[in-house]
Amino acid sequence: MDERPCRDKLRIDDSGKRTQIVDCPLLAVCPAQAAVRRVPTAQVWVATPAALLASRAEPATYKTQWVIPAQHELDLLVADEADQVMTQFDKQFMHHEPLTSPDGWSSRIALAWHEGLARTWYRPMAERQGLRYQQYAAYHAAALAGLLPLLMRLLTEGQEGEGAGSELLGEVTADGPFSGHTLLMRLARAMHGITSRVEEQQQSHLWERAEEYFHTHFARLVEDPFGTPPPGLKLLVDTMTSGYDTESSAEEVAQDWLTHHIPEGMPHPGERLAEFARVLVAGCWSARITNTVFELSHMQESLRSLMGAEDTNNMLAHQPKPELLALVPEQPMGNMMALQWTRNPKQDRGSLDLLWLRGVGRWLLYHLHDLLACEGVEGPHVLLSSATSYNPLSARYHIDILPTLILREPPDCADAIRKSRLYFRPRRRPGHERGIYVSGAGGRGARQAAVRAMTDAVCTPDPGAAHSLLEQVLEGCDPDRRRALFVALSTEDAATSAHYMNTRTGVRAVHVVPDRQAPGLYGLNHRRISAFPRTDAQVMAAAEGSAGRGHNMLNEHGVAAIQAIFYLARLHPPPTDLSFPLAVLNAQAMQRLLNPILCDDPDADAANEMRKLAFGARATWSTMMGRPLNFRAMKEDYLRHAFVADQGASLYQTTGRGLRGNVPVQVYLLDAAFAPRAADPRDTAPDTDRTSVLVACRDLTRQMLADPGPTADPRARLNHQIHTAVWGLLGHLLDTIDWG
């Protein structure tokens, strides 16, 4: 220490009113200050989570995705809004594509193909790739036309709920994702008398025989659905795909084949023969659908250059790169491309979707610092920052890494949140005595009508009143903060609300539009929502989550221009939204990866543990998938807790848009679905955590913030302190809800 060259050479100036200034004459060469000297010339990379995994690092020398050179080049990697980064990583490895819903993939590619042919006078038909595309497009349409009637038949015959178990096809499709392999393997097991989906010791020989039966008769139908079929099944395939009227239907041919191929020692299926035949036909069609989806997607790029076809959102463009697939662990149930039949029996219809599961995407977030450690590459230091990413009950937001630092809110900010309020004010109109329900309205048309009714109820006075609810609330706001945010369930709902305000009321409104779309007459692109205070609009309508983070809407005084937030609909994703089930699967998979089962014990059975892991993942999947997502219908506590925790975090984030600059905000919850019993003046029973997402969120937050007591272990005490710091103010908002 005495021999340092800077000893006794520091000049300290403490004559001013500020903190003393230290001037070091050797700062330019001091090794302790090397990092400080590099800051002005440091190279900074800025990337979105999707670009980090999908965009090639060009024009840099690396011919790979940015996440790989980041391991070699970066000293520090900062992931802001880490929970959103985690969600983006998940999406990169889980692709969901509706096929037969309105504007589904199948209709988009068919429309683009035929319009392209018409524009080019059918010139592509003279090209080899054009003919091949036409061939597979015809295969795809025929496969859909063959499978969909079998699935819709289950609806018309009432094959739902427990009744689906009497029809093997209904049982398999209700379990969750299925494929040609799934259907034909289940058929092989059923032919051998195996009814349970769990392998039992006394039936192990039957399972082996069923697998051998599958590989003997059905494997070629799945592995190469457009190749030469097995000799015994050639008549069935020819009948299914024939271009002329055949003497027998495909189901009749399938029944005949099954009758002549009953496994040795097994009884005749009897009354279930027709049921098994439908599964055989459905398995063949399913294998053809997944194969044609892949082939058509693969051919789209070359076809676009040939005929200038419209971009139909090629699903191959959304798939992770091979170098990342080599690193990311598989899903516990295995990586797969499968079909998902989501039934809506009330409306006698359903949607056939394609799911492509490629791995546990959030694993990358946990390993950004050592992604290439197995190759001897020391990765960057990683800083994950987020205000809502530590809640073990949440599937979408929780990052299972103990925080090392918590930045507390300033006292002024905490006071602003304590002064803020949540108001439950269900809106009523003639014909809506129980309150207007937007969430759960049922069907696109009914929900759009409910959005218009709700918007009207907020923007026009009640019978006998002089002012509307919106006018009353804005009149009580600060003069420079008299703007409101309307929160809807979707971009379409937000557009409907804004259009109604502008055309049917005196309220001026804009609605948030995704950046990839033209804004239109009343639209405001997402990247420009910070400009909302500079427009002449009083209200901005946005889909839930789109205005929750990333953009501040400030007035000329630098504080939030929005003082009132109106939730037109209850916090609830659409029934067919798969993001929540996939988040639960990923959260459970990550738990297993962070806490693996060690098989170093001589008595440990690694194979059995793997079977249990895969079975548990499939059980979770089948619990959530194959039926519309519904809060009140969830029976499993872990699913309800995850759902409620996710919605509470989203509410907290959106509320923050009105808190910028340490000013309070008023949040009005208008949908009767928030608390159905409280919304109905004739119902005297209180809402519970089973009927109201608000009550469930309040009770769950209280449970999380409860003091574990002095006898609790240190980890429990530490978690309590973290939860109090992160979620304590949300707990205050929920505890002080004004129920009206």
Question: Which residues are covered by each model-predicted region?
Answer:
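Low-complexity, highly charged intrinsically disordered N-terminal segments
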Residues: M1-I12, M266-P345, R349
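Conserved interdomain hinge at the start of the Helicase C-terminal
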Residues: A373-E378, F424-Y500
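Extended, charge-rich low-complexity regions and/or helical-solenoid scaffolds
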Residues: R483-L521, G558-Y567, H572-T576, P581-R592
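Cysteine-cluster motifs in flexible loop/terminal segments that predominantly coordinate metals
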Residues: M1-P40
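Conserved Walker A/P-loop ATP-binding site and its immediately adjacent core
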Residues: M1-P5, L10, A50-A54, V85-F89, ...
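The feature captures the C-terminal accessory region of ATP-dependent helicases
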Residues: N502, F631-A633, D646, Y652, ...
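Signature of the SF2 helicase/ATPase Hel1-core->accessory helical subdomain module
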Residues: L26-Q43, A47-F294, L354-L357, R362-W363, ...
